[in-house]
Amino acid sequence: MDPSVTLWQFLLQLLREQGNGHIISWTSRDGGEFKLVDAEEVARLWGLRKNKTNMNYDKLSRALRYYYDKNIIRKVSGQKFVYKFVSYPEVAGCSTEDCPPQPEVSVTSAIAMAPATVHAGPGDTATGKPGTPKGAGMTGQGGLARSSRNEYMRSGLYSTFTIQSLQPQPQPPIPPRPASVLPNTTPAGVPAPASGSRSTSPNPLEACLEAEEAGLPLQVILTPPEAPNQKSEELSLDPSFGHPQPPEVKVEGPKEELEAARAGGFSSEAVKAEPEVSASEGLLARLPAILTENTAQVCGLSTSTTEITQPQKGRKPRDLELPLSPSLLGGQGPERTPGSGTSSGLQAPGPALTPSLLPTHTLTPVLLTPSSLPPSIHFWSTLSPIAPRSPAKLSFQFPSSGSAQVHIPSISVDGLSTPVVLSPGPQKP
């Protein structure tokens, strides 16, 4: 037998043969049911056909499950080794004695469940196989197998892909239908551009024509590149437009101010220096009041000996007085230091060297009010037990800067004989 025969064809051939009743037999020819009387023998014969010596019923049953999905063979539930042809195939060349009644089986199978027959062609029967004339001269066993194999391959039962591939083939006449519709639309659109291409109908030809017409003005505009520049220059020179004028007004404004400033004899640097001068003038304006308060405090403290005994911290305020000496002594330095040199100029604010007036001078750059400080500073200075390291420095710490301070350098070391001052005084190294 031909090895290309499928399993269901092999079983059907066994059922057609009269001498195979002991291994396979019909249980219901009308329903297409058959039973594997000797399932192992049927499997062995199927193995011989496929050249597989190790074939058994387990492998045969798994092969039959493949036809479950193809809707060719179905297992009858509740009965062992009983199967049923769902779509009973017609084998060409079989005689009426060997073949079961085909019309009855085909009708019952078509009524029961035969979705493959729905996809069959006009020449197909309920089996889904193309109809072939019986007795076409193919009496040979190999010829029957080949024809059945080829017919099965061409039928829709072999694979669903063949059905899907055969369906688009009869559809070529369908594309001419849109083609016939297109000529109807194109003639309607052809006269429209001829009469007036500006019509509102959204035809592709009109859109293309409009795009071409729209491209022509672009070429005309690009040919004279100097025209836009002239127009822009005219727009900039034209006084009717207000956009270019504001920059001119903004530019002319500062120029007029600079010219007016130059005409008046003031430069931009002088204008910038005015706030600084005003700030320095404000400081100088307040300095007399601060200095008068300082001198008044010095006069009040000159009677006590503690004012003279506090020059120990004199060296620390010198660093603080260096940046302040040029600004604080800008106009009053010569009055306070009439005959002193550079060293006396740095030590000119004598009251700042005492702890009583040190906080006031450190606060003057911050422009804080020193009016509330003198009472507390006065008590702190009278109660401070700090004594100078050497009394010889007293004459250099307080140069004569006013009539109120004339008595300060005249005080000698004997004036330090108060018990409050002499307790820590000369004993320090």
Curated annotation (Swiss-Prot):
Pro residues bias (residue ranges): 169-178
Phosphothreonine PTM sites in chain numbering: T337, T354, T364, T369, T418
Keyword field contains Nucleus: yes
GO biological process: cellular response to gamma radiation; cellular response to testosterone stimulus; gene expression; hippocampal neuron apoptotic process; liver development; lung development; positive regulation of DNA-templated transcription; positive regulation of transcription by RNA polymerase II
Region (Sufficient for interaction with MAD2L2): 350-400
GO cellular component: axon terminus; dendrite; mitochondrial membrane; neuronal cell body; nucleoplasm
Record: glycosylation sites: T382
Protein's cellular compartments: Nucleus
The record's account of how the chain is modified after translation: Sumoylation represses transcriptional activator activity as it results in recruitment of HDAC2 to target gene promoters which leads to decreased histone acetylation and reduced transactivator activity. It also regulates nuclear retention. On mitogenic stimulation, phosphorylated on C-terminal serine and threonine residues by MAPK1 but also MAPK8 and/or MAPK9. Phosphorylation leads to loss of sumoylation and restores transcriptional activator activity. Phosphorylated and activated by CaMK4, MAPK11, MAPK12 and MAPK14. Upon bFGF stimulus, phosphorylated by PAK1. Phosphorylated by PRP4K at Thr-418; phosphorylation activation ELK1 transcriptional activity.
Gene Ontology molecular function, alphabetical: chromatin binding; DNA-binding transcription activator activity, RNA polymerase II-specific; DNA-binding transcription factor activity; DNA-binding transcription factor activity, RNA polymerase II-specific; mediator complex binding; RNA polymerase II cis-regulatory region sequence-specific DNA binding; RNA polymerase II-specific DNA-binding transcription factor binding; transcription regulator activator activity
DNA-binding region range list: 5-86
Polar residues bias (residue ranges): 302-312
Crosslink site: Glycyl lysine isopeptide (Lys-Gly) (interchain with G-Cter in SUMO): K231, K250, K255
Modified residues (Phosphoserine): S325, S384, S390, S423
Tissue specificity note: Predominantly expressed in the brain, and to a lesser extent in the heart, liver and muscle.
Keywords for the protein's UniProt record, in alphabetical order: Activator, DNA-binding, Glycoprotein, Isopeptide bond, Nucleus, Phosphoprotein, Transcription, Transcription regulation, Ubl conjugation
Function in brief: Transcription factor that binds to purine-rich DNA sequences. Forms a ternary complex with SRF and the ETS and SRF motifs of the serum response element (SRE) on the promoter region of immediate early genes such as FOS and IER2. Induces target gene transcription upon JNK and MAPK-signaling pathways stimulation.
PANTHER family documented for this protein: ETS, ETS DOMAIN-CONTAINING PROTEIN ELK-1
Quaternary structure and interacting proteins, as annotated: Interacts in its sumoylated form with PIAS2/PIASX which enhances its transcriptional activator activity. Interacts with MAD2L2; the interaction is direct and promotes phosphorylation by the kinases MAPK8 and/or MAPK9. Interacts with POU1F1.
Family per similarity comment: Belongs to the ETS family.
Full protein name: ETS domain-containing protein Elk-1
Naturally occurring in which organism (per UniProt): Mus musculus (Mouse)
